[in-house]
């Protein structure tokens, strides 16, 4: 459990730092909320659920886009506005110096009906799939 907690905390701090670099003011809620941070820019507040990806055996990453272990469910607009998946590419891939931030609105996740995402750096997939289906959401900050 400590390992998962550290992965999650690292992800939250990485996303907060990235969003601060992009001009967002960041706040962290106190208590049990379904979102991890609030990002404000130009008077607009966005509730963000951060999902930190974990490296799998074959070099891809997996991140859950849902909540719950036994009773999985999709986040909805009453819970948060977007999910930002953090992928520590710079730590795990030699020659890649930037981490991945995949910005996906909850409406899009509900539309796609995906409980998890498999992520990898563009052009570094295996077999015929060289770019993951989620690449279009990488650094999609304008969607929030």
Where in the sequence are the language-model features?
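Mixed-charge (Asp/Glu-Lys/Arg
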Residues: 1-33, 39-144
């Amino acid at each position: 459990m400590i390992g998962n907690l550290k992965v999650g905390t690292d992800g939250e701090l990485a996303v907060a730092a990235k969003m601060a670099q992009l001009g967002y003011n960041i706040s962290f809620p106190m208590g049990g909320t379904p979102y991890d941070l609030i990002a404000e820019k130009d008077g607009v507040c966005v509730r963000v659920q951060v999902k930190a990806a974990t490296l799998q055996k074959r070099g891809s990453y997996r991140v859950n886009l849902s909540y719950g272990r036994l009773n999985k469910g999709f986040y909805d607009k009453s819970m948060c506005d977007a999910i930002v998946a953090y992928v520590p590419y710079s730590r795990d891939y030699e020659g890649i110096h930037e981490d991945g931030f995949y910005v996906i609105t909850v409406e899009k996740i509900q539309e796609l009906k995906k409980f998890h995402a498999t992520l990898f750096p563009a052009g570094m997939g295996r077999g015929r799939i060289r770019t993951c289906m989620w690449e279009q959401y990488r650094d999609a900050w304008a969607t929030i």
